[in-house]
Amino acid sequence: MQKVTIQEAEHLLQEIMSEEDDRFQILIKDERKGVQKLISKWYKQKELAQKEKEKFLEMSKYENALREKGLTYIAGIDEVGRGPLAGPVVTAAVVLPEDFYIPGLNDSKKLSEAKRERFYDEIKAQAIAIGVGIVSPQVIDEINIYQATKQAMLDAVANLSCTPQYLLIDAMKLPTPIPQTSIIKGDAKSISISAASIIAKVTRDRMMKELGEKYPAYGFEQHMGYGTKQHLEAIEAHGILEEHRKSFAPIKDMIQK
């Protein structure tokens, strides 16, 4: 191989998967600082990819154990929006195929918005089935947020295009005959729950951004309905909306004044 430019070396390293590659053996002997920098970057990327693979494998242990028992339709379930003062609680149920792989998959709260959006599209493309459950602020006020979350989760399961054989749920138990396991911090321990958390989060964020367009004075697209200083000041200045949860403090206290 003739001596390559730094740019050509960069392109080559994007193609090279192993140190055994003859092209890599030539590049590693190239003493130019630019090439050595690229080699160092290549090693770091390989190390990161290996860590992501190990993390993904660790997060697949619940699904793999159930598949070993002959189960195929394993639904991960998670919710988003229990704490906000406005907007719905949104849940998702996701059934993944055995060959599913997205490096870097994690609890949706630990991902950037750009990464969540990208993973959302990838999950949509790869999943066997996705169901979403949405419960309004009015119903939350009627039956309380805990019961509303349960209802949204049951709705998400009902909205799947297949009947799940097992449920992996983030920190909840559901009144259903389907066998289930409740996992504390499940969105960081199970790929199915993690995928569900991303679907639920992106779905709800998009709804809140639409609400932000409808009520520009409230800034919903920024705080997603949570009780930030900006949100509380907007309520004081412009009043309580039908999208607000009247049973949540401090809105409840404002109504009682």
UniProtKB/Swiss-Prot annotation:
Its UniProt entry gives the catalysed reaction(s) as:
Endonucleolytic cleavage to 5'-phosphomonoester
GO aspect biological process, one term: mismatch repair
Where does the protein principally reside?
cytoplasm
Enzyme Commission designation: 3.1.26.4
Which cofactors must be present for this protein to function? Mn(2+); Mg(2+)
Record keyword Metal-binding present: yes
Q: How is the cofactor bound?
A: Manganese or magnesium. Binds 1 divalent metal ion per monomer in the absence of substrate. May bind a second metal ion after substrate binding.
- Enzyme class of the recorded protein, top EC level: hydrolase
Q: Where is the RNase H type-2 domain?
A: 72-257
Subcellular location field: Cytoplasm
Source organism superkingdom: Bacteria
Q: Known SUPFAM superfamilies for this protein?
A: Ribonuclease H-like (SSF53098)
One GO cellular component from the entry?
A: cytoplasm
Q: Fetch the PROSITE patterns from UniProt.
A: RNASE_H_2 (PS51975)
The alphabetized UniProt keywords are: Cytoplasm, Endonuclease, Hydrolase, Manganese, Metal-binding, Nuclease
**NCBIfam families (alphabetical):** PRK00015.1-1 (NF000594), PRK00015.1-3 (NF000595)
Which family does the record claim for this protein?
Belongs to the RNase HII family.
Protein's name in the database: Ribonuclease HII
What organism is listed for this UniProt entry?
Answer: Bacillus cereus (strain Q1)
